[in-house]
Structures are given as structure tokens and as C-alpha cells.
Amino acid sequence: MIKVAIVDDSAVVRQVLSSMLENQPDITLLGCARDPLFALKLFEQQWPDVIILDIEMPRMDGITFLKKVMAEKPTPVVICSTLTEQGASVTIAALAAGAVDIITKPKLGLKGFLEESQARLLQAIRAAAKASVAKLRVNGLAKPMPVIAKHNADVVLASTNHALNQTTDRVVALGTSTGGTHALEYVLTALPRTSAGIVVVQHMPEHFTAAFASRLNGVCEMEVKEAEDNDRVMPGLVLIANGGKHMLLQRSGAQYRVQLKDGPLVSRHRPSVDVLFRSVANAAGKNALGVIMTGMGDDGARGLLEMHQCGAITLAQDEASCVVYGMPKEAVKLGAVSRQVALDNIAEEIIAFTKQ
């Protein structure tokens, strides 16, 4: 049974989130607190397995509380954030401080949105409960997701079984979820500006990916930006898929460009790693390197298999270094992986691939 605590200064939000946890056979609500100081008193009685945390609260802000939790008893924390530019920036800082995931505050009175919010909340809690927080590489720097139906990536992109044109450009595709913001920062900050162009899907709600890309851009030698439709993939550039849209790689003559598409959730996500990887298999073939990293579920496993079958080098982050060994595990089970590597070694694999 996953014991959950909610820390939010809004009584309405606490009530709505609490109601979303009712009747879940594997989740129990340990309690709610209106600010971090009340939360710490609550935790004296019993410590939760997962904490749902607001950022802006009286008496102690969420990031200060988060750092205190991580110092005293590292615990999976899911940030419950507002959809504002300022909220996004602070939320990304919270991820850097050790939080494992983001959910957006539910829009009250909108039944469809509440149902979507509940699905995302439960998914985040179950993933967080499996997270090995001690494995986070924390540097200490400071559209609603539609529900459920598990679509095949064919609903977003056409079949990839046709002949590949040749091009000399190299492309690196990275896919990750829970724990991935820390892992991506760890890898990308180790890469020189001369590295091959990189396309990334990190499971994250829309409105947050721009702030995440901006943060990475401030600490990486490579340029990092949120992808825009028709952006060219170039050496020295990292394109982060927008939250709420699928990102595909396409060939345009001798160039690679990205296309952003709406569409249903694929493998329960949008953006989907499967959609990106399958498009990379189609567009780049053996000129690509695919890396599936920490995260829960199976998104990306089939797409990595198609990359493998098209001659790409395919890597999976190993279990010992994953915060959640889910997506890499499923890819290994499918036979999609050339080899498993530790997080410490992923950057050098990308550098070696660039020099080939």
C-alpha cells in the first residue's frame, strides 16, 4: 500500500486531490497539511511513501521544505504546480532540488479535466513510489493529458517499413521519464559543443518543457531549447519535445528536422518516446544512436526495437543507476538494446558515436 501525504495551502486543492485517491486499492491517504510545518508534525507519526507538494505556501516555501526532506529522509516528491510561467520556472527548480515528477493543479468544475488530472495523479504517485530517490543526481540548483487509451504509435506516424535514404549526419535520440530530469542534466552537461544533434522526449506536462530547456541551456555547453516545428537538428543543439505534443524526426534532403504533432496519448504519454524513436528509425536508420533512460512503464521500448532493427546503436540505462528501472527493462526484454550502460557512461557513448 502506497502511503501518500498532501501538502498544499489551498483547502479546496487538498479536498480535490484527496477525493482523487479514494477507492484506490494500492493507495492510502496518510493525511493532509496546509503548510510544511504542519506536514513535519504529521510525519512524526508516520512518514509517507510519496509526498504531493505545493511550491508557494506560508511559513516555509515548498523548495525549502523539499530540500529539508531530501536531507533528513529522502522521499519521492511530486510537485503540484500552477500553469504559469513563474510557476513553471519554480517547479523546474524543485525538480533540480530532488522532486521526481510534476502534476498540474486540477481545474475545478471541469469534469473532463478532473478525470484527466486524476489519471495523471495516480500515474505519478505509482511511478514515484517505485523511485529510488537515493540514485538521483541532484545538483542542488536552485493541455491536460487525455486519459488512458493505450494507442499504438501507428496512430501518429505511418509505418516505418520502407527503404532508408542515406545521409552522413548523425542523430542522438534520448527518451526518459521519472527521474529523467536529473539524468538528462547529468548527461548533457558532460557533452562538448561539438556533439551530434540530440532530440529528447522527457515526460512532462506542457508549459514546463520551455522552462526545463532554459535551465539546461544555462548549464550545458550545447545549446538546449524547446523544439519548434521544423527546427533543424544540428551538431551542438539539443531539442526538447514540447509537453503536450508528439515530436517526430523527418528527413528534408540531407537535413534532419523535427515535426510537432497533436494526437492521442501513445503508451500513455504525449510526447511519446515510442513516436520519437520510431520516427528516428524511419528517418535516420543506422545514422542514429538511441538511449532509453530511467522511467516507469514501457514507452520507447518498441520504438527502440525498430531503431535497433534499422541498424542504429541502441543503449539502455542500467538498473543500478536508474531511479526507476521500467522503460529500460521493457526495452531489454524486447531485445531492443545493443547494450546496457551506467548513467556515468552515457555521455562518453554519445561522444564516441559523434566521432565515428
Curated annotation (Swiss-Prot):
Every CheB-type methylesterase domain range: 165-356
Gene3D superfamilies in the cross-refs: 3.40.50.2300, Methylesterase CheB, C-terminal domain (3.40.50.180)
Entry keyword Ribonucleoprotein: no
EC number(s) per entry: 3.1.1.61, 3.5.1.44
Active-site residues from the entry: 177, 203, 299
Keyword Nucleus annotated: no
Start and end residues of each Response regulatory domain: 3-120
Stored InterPro entries: CheB-like, CheB_C, CheY-like_superfamily, Sig_transdc_resp-reg_Me-estase, Sig_transdc_resp-reg_receiver
Main location class: cytoplasm
Residues with 4-aspartylphosphate modification: 54
GO terms for MF: phosphorelay response regulator activity; protein-glutamate methylesterase activity; protein-glutamine glutaminase activity
Keywords: Chemotaxis, Cytoplasm, Hydrolase, Phosphoprotein
GO biological process, one term: chemotaxis
GO CC term (a single one): cytoplasm
CDD domains: CheB_Rec, REC_CheB-like
Record's comment on post-translational modification: Phosphorylated by CheA. Phosphorylation of the N-terminal regulatory domain activates the methylesterase activity.
Record localization: Cytoplasm
Catalytic activity: [protein]-L-glutamate 5-O-methyl ester + H2O = L-glutamyl-[protein] + methanol + H(+); L-glutaminyl-[protein] + H2O = L-glutamyl-[protein] + NH4(+)
SMART domains, sorted: REC
One Pfam family of this chain: Response_reg
Domain comment in the entry: Contains a C-terminal catalytic domain, and an N-terminal region which modulates catalytic activity.
Function as written in the Swiss-Prot or TrEMBL entry: Involved in chemotaxis. Part of a chemotaxis signal transduction system that modulates chemotaxis in response to various stimuli. Catalyzes the demethylation of specific methylglutamate residues introduced into the chemoreceptors (methyl-accepting chemotaxis proteins or MCP) by CheR. Also mediates the irreversible deamidation of specific glutamine residues to glutamic acid.
Family according to the record: Belongs to the CheB family.
Name under which the protein is recorded: Protein-glutamate methylesterase/protein-glutamine glutaminase 3
